[in-house]
Amino acid sequence: MIKTKIMGILNVTPDSFSDGGQYHSVDQAVKRAKEMIDEGVDIIDVGGVSTRPGHKEVSHKEVSLKEEMNRVLPVVESIVKYDVQISVDTFRSEVAEACLKLGVSMINDQWAGLFDSNMFNVVSQYGAEIVLMHNGDGHRDKPVVEEMLVSLLAQANKAELAGIPHNKIWLDPGIGFAKTREEENEVMARLDELVATEYPVLLATSRKRYIKEMMNQDSSPSDRDEATAATTAYGIMKGVRGVRVHNVLLNTRLAQSMDFLKENEYERHHLS
């Protein structure tokens, strides 16, 4: 049975939109990492630069390379010994390499290698996995899904040319980044087209504005977990291979059930 991977979010920033400052100290971050492991997480994604609404392309100007290193490296060094895969959410190859040297095995690049052209070489050198997220400035000359596919496949091709195997390249449609609400609806409705590329797909909707608008009511980020879980179920039915979430326990339980139901359906449709 194919298992949907649960990527738990561990923001070690003072200003992330959902949990900024909550895990800013190493001790707090380690405690949360242990909780996520107990809850069944497959991958812990450590991020040192906020991607809250409005940050987009200015993040690298507001947080220096040195500051990002100071936030991320002590946490990574403290949790990489645990029996769980560690990912680092960064668009800087210097941060990626420093973390890969410590034993990290995945880099989650919100700019898909467009910000730092050396990212693919670094990830390839360490035999790691990479997540390529669709991003941009919101201006496009073709419909959103077509533009997303062209952009992500171009970057995935560069990653493969750098020596990263196909099965270690994840694609993330970038819900919450450089898209209107209608464009996000279009991307969600056509997730199967991204899945059809045969790269593993990671869906990251957790607690985002998209969830708030889907609920059609004012809500704090932590009140959006059940609706986030609905997108997890939907994504699994569409064929995504992983989800990036804040509430690990809820999504782990849901994913286990969805995986069982999908496997059950497959087996019964393929009985000889």
UniProtKB/Swiss-Prot annotation:
Summary of subunit composition and partner proteins: Homodimer.
List of residues binding (7,8-dihydropterin-6-yl)methyl diphosphate: T51, D89, N108, D172, K208, R244, V245, H246
Reactions that this protein is recorded to catalyse: (7,8-dihydropterin-6-yl)methyl diphosphate + 4-aminobenzoate = 7,8-dihydropteroate + diphosphate
Function of the molecule: Catalyzes the condensation of para-aminobenzoate (pABA) with 6-hydroxymethyl-7,8-dihydropterin diphosphate (DHPt-PP) to form 7,8-dihydropteroate (H2Pte), the immediate precursor of folate derivatives.
PROSITE patterns: DHPS_1, DHPS_2, PTERIN_BINDING
Domain of life of the source: Bacteria
The organism of origin for this protein: Staphylococcus epidermidis (strain ATCC 35984 / DSM 28319 / BCRC 17069 / CCUG 31568 / BM 3577 / RP62A)
Enzyme Commission number: 2.5.1.15
Listed name of the protein: Dihydropteroate synthase
Keyword Magnesium in annotation: yes
Family membership noted in the UniProt record: Belongs to the DHPS family.
Catalytic class of the enzyme: transferase
Pterin-binding domain ranges (all copies): 1-251
Coiled coil location: none
Pfam families documented for this protein: Pterin_bind (PF00809)
Chain sites annotated for binding Mg(2+): N11
Annotated GO biological process: folic acid biosynthetic process; tetrahydrofolate biosynthetic process
